[in-house]
């Protein structure tokens, strides 16, 4: 069967749902597709389809990242449903990096919970520029004052992570009731989408910069070759363009021989697109998650850099104790996850939770990086720091 061509008419935006486990992120994602499907803006995707990776079923919690697409009158959206449970924050770090904006889902029954805080922090550290809040399960709260209190708490939390908590739209509703077709709650979904349309700015796409796409996954397709998937971070790619694959080892040169998005063929891909790229003459095992595909000569792999880093407090889910020179956590750059050694400044004996400090970091394998890129520091399955590269050393 031949694939249909992907039409670019409306501006495109990548968003996602974030928030605490069981606050209703996946139900809301399903409800958005249901309500928008009634005006032809989406194909209804039910909860089980969004929550679909095999290991997810066993634990009843969302683990991997699901992509759905829909459109409003203003924009076309690719929506990511992010994992909620802290065991799977690793996935969120790479997932949240794919967002131009996010819908923070907070249960009106519980109010903000530990992962609500962690996801706001992660959004801040991976550079999600703006958030809209959906106060879910309001049908289960009888006292309007209670809703006002929860809303106030959410606004204060957003402000504490340097988001404009006073102006962020907070929409009250019930994703489940909307999914069940109750008119009042379907209206709250439309109101939410209106807030997303108007409040989350149309991202400035860096079309003019050299092409770069972090590698998320690699597949081998019989008779066609190797396909690499990811979200284009900057620039454009056309069929026939030369590219380089960089990081985690030697640099490989190849050519882009095909591009597809949402199972439709494209002539070109551009910043913001989640796409699959067919590459010529490269074996499946020569490319791995964590590398980047880029315009030849545009990016260099590095191992040593200076960074400004914020170390999370115990209350934020970070370390309980200080760390010292030569501490070795994991560093997350885009989709890469690499061990590195930390060198403290000469006048600093140790770094305590809550400190903001300049560090020199040396990774065990080179990663494509440039000044201004953000990264996360993790240890034993939890985020312990957020940083930005201030200077490349080697």
Curated annotation (Swiss-Prot):
Q: Where are the transmembrane segments?
A: none
Its annotated compartments are:
Mitochondrion
Q: Which GO terms describe its biological process?
A: mitochondrial translational elongation
> Which keywords label this protein?
Elongation factor, GTP-binding, Mitochondrion, Nucleotide-binding, Protein biosynthesis
Cited PANTHER family? ELONGATION FACTOR TU, MITOCHONDRIAL, ELONGATION FACTOR TU-RELATED
Domain tr-type G, by residue range, is 10-204
Residue ranges of the region described as G1: 19-26
Known Gene3D superfamilies for this protein?
P-loop containing nucleotide triphosphate hydrolases, Translation factors
In which residues is GTP bound? 19-26, 81-85, 136-139
Q: What is its main location?
A: mitochondrion
The segment annotated G4 runs over: 136-139
Asked if the record carries the keyword Mitochondrion, the reply is: yes
Could you tell me which residues belong to the region G3?
A: 81-84
Recorded protein name is Elongation factor Tu, mitochondrial
PROSITE patterns annotated for this entry?
Answer: G_TR_1, G_TR_2
Q: Where is this region: G2?
A: 60-64
Which Pfam family name is an example for this entry? GTP_EFTU_D2
Q: Which GO terms describe its molecular function?
A: GTP binding; GTPase activity; translation elongation factor activity
Q: Which HAMAP family match?
A: EF_Tu_B
Query: GO CC terms for this protein?
Result: mitochondrion
